[in-house]
Curated annotation (Swiss-Prot):
The gene is miaB. Its main location: cytoplasm. PANTHER family: CDK5 REGULATORY SUBUNIT-ASSOCIATED PROTEIN 1 (PTHR43020), MITOCHONDRIAL TRNA METHYLTHIOTRANSFERASE CDK5RAP1 (PTHR43020:SF2). It catalyses: N(6)-dimethylallyladenosine(37) in tRNA + (sulfur carrier)-SH + AH2 + 2 S-adenosyl-L-methionine = 2-methylsulfanyl-N(6)-dimethylallyladenosine(37) in tRNA + (sulfur carrier)-H + 5'-deoxyadenosine + L-methionine + A + S-adenosyl-L-homocysteine + 2 H(+). [4Fe-4S] cluster 1 binds at C12, C49, C83. Catalyzes the methylthiolation of N6-(dimethylallyl)adenosine (i(6)A), leading to the formation of 2-methylthio-N6-(dimethylallyl)adenosine (ms(2)i(6)A) at position 37 in tRNAs that read codons beginning with uridine. Signal peptide: none annotated. This is tRNA-2-methylthio-N(6)-dimethylallyladenosine synthase.
Length: 474
């Protein structure tokens, strides 16, 4: 009988991606199968996130529950990974004696060897090092789980915003080689994946090495991926305004596979607070990016992250944020009350905005974003939207569920044969968290793009050398 693995994941999409790779590794090298029930597992893995307040205590509460399982089964192996493990590994081991292994985001590829060591009776293992891109060299071939897939193109961040722990828990920016990224996506496309979401803490800082020792920019990578046969929808997250350059905006103008939706975190609309956060840009520069984007792609929708109650945030600072929200007309946001992260520069600042003020401002901001999102949804009434069908509807398994380019869930009635493909639906009703549609046509009635080689795409974009001679670089 195969052994069983249970993984509990907290945090961002990068953590979700990492957890899927842990499962693949444990299956490929150890023969473990996933289980949803911790009580059935031989190995329990907790993939942690350090972004939210009291992240460390949340870890210990979960480990306390798992300790009871280990008391009943001394052979049970418990591991802690992710950003809290990277930041607080020794503290976890000292406080939770039930933990057998602790590993960071950059060492999850060593998981099978760590398990071998524990199964052989070895001592607890702690490995929270930063071995650069080695992690991706050791991962097994990707396995598709539905028509949409995440693909990590880089790790870490080198921006060192004053509030953020990512550079300390995931290391500085390291890009995967171009060929590795393209191969993984091509393998997923062969398994039926139609939509790819490129992942990284700061994807637009991507600088991947090519086979001929050149550097591939993020804009060039987008065009390469869009040219892969079978990939008809392309997303990416997350990006930083200071590296959202014109060449990336140009991709929106000529690459229909790239969706009309962008998550571009701004955090605050106050120049004073942005400076305190060490974001490297002002509010007007952010708005300039959005204006140029909407010139290239008029129907693009934008979402953002906001931190409420950063140290020193005055009422005027908050009003500046609300003014930015009004000017940009965000479609969605991830908004958080500020809480100091240990070891960050901002943690040395006085947390002088009261909790009641933070909660009040958060409610005001979220209400405004919700109103704007509902207005966008209502504008879709009567329109025909192309959606990627993900599977049965959550509330009614006799119906289907898909997503628009702007990530809105649409429920509709149609033949299950359409799961995994694109369909056109007319939007007939709008709800707070979803849309209702009527099926119009399936993929066999659509005029989808013809297959193109990557060189066909890139050859359209000229480059001038230092002498001013125009070259076309395939």
């Amino acid at each position: 009988m195969s052994k069983k693995l249970h993984i509990k994941t907290w945090g961002c999409q990068m953590n979700e991606y990492d957890s899927s790779k842990m499962a693949d590794l444990m299956d490929e090298y150890k023969g473990y199968t996933l289980t949803e029930e911790a009580e059935e597992a031989d190995v329990l893995l907790l993939n942690t996130c350090s972004i939210r307040e009291k992240a460390q205590e949340k870890v210990f509460h979960q480990l306390g529950r798992w300790k009871k399982l280990k008391d009943k089964n001394p052979n049970l192996i418990i591991g802690v990974g992710g950003c809290v493990a990277s930041q607080e590994g020794k503290v976890i081991k000292d406080r939770a004696q039930c933990v057998d292994l602790i590993f960071g985001p950059q060492t999850l590829h060593r998981l099978p060897e760590m398990i071998d060591q524990i199964e052989a009776g070895g001592k607890a293992v702690i490995d929270v090092s930063f071995p650069e891109i080695e992690k991706f060299d050791r991962l097994p071939e990707p396995r598709a789980d539905g028509p949409s897939a995440f693909v990590s193109i880089m790790e870490g961040c080198s921006k060192y915003c004053s509030f953020c722990v990512v550079p300390y828990t995931r290391g500085e920016e390291v890009s995967r080689p171009l060929d590795d990224v393209i191969l993984e996506i091509a393998q997923l496309a062969e398994q039926g994946v139609r939509e790819v979401n490129l992942l990284g803490q700061n994807v637009n800082a991507y600088r991947g090495a090519t086979h001929d020792d050149e550097i591939c920019t993020f804009a060039e990578l987008l065009r390469y991926v869009a040219a892969i046969d079978g990939i008809d929808r392309l997303r990416f997250t997350t990006s930083h305004p200071i590296e959202f350059t014109q060449d990336i905006i140009d991709v929106y103008e000529d690459t229909p596979e790239l969706v009309s939706f962008l998550h571009l975190p701004v955090q605050s609309g106050s120049d004073r607070i942005l400076t305190q956060m060490k974001r490297g840009h002002m509010a007007i520069e952010y708005k300039s990016i959005i204006r140029r984007l909407r010139k290239a792609r008029p129907d693009i929708q934008v979402s953002s992250d906001f931190i409420i109650g950063f140290p020193g945030e005055s009422k005027q600072d908050f009003e500046d944020t609300m003014k930015l929200i009004e000017d940009v007309q965000f479609d969605h946001s991830f908004s958080f009350i500020y809480s100091a992260r240990p070891g960050t520069p901002a943690s040395d600042l006085p947390d002088d905005v009261t909790l009641d003020e933070k909660k009040e401002r958060l409610a005001i901001l979220q209400d405004r974003i919700t109103q704007q999102a509902m207005r966008y949804s209502r504008q879709m009434l009567g329109t025909v939207q192309r959606i990627l069908v993900e599977g049965p509807s959550v509330k009614n398994p006799m119906e289907l569920r898909g997503r628009t380019e702007t990530s809105r869930v649409v429920n509709f009635e149609a033949d299950p044969k359409h799961i995994g493909s694109f369909v056109d639906v007319e939007i007939v009703d709008v709800y707070t968290n979803s849309l209702r549609g009527n099926f119009i046509r399936g993929e066999d009635e659509m005029d989808l793009r013809r297959s193109l080689r990557p060189s066909d795409i890139l050859a359209k974009h000229k480059k001038d050398d230092e002498l001013g001679v125009t070259q076309y670089i395939p």
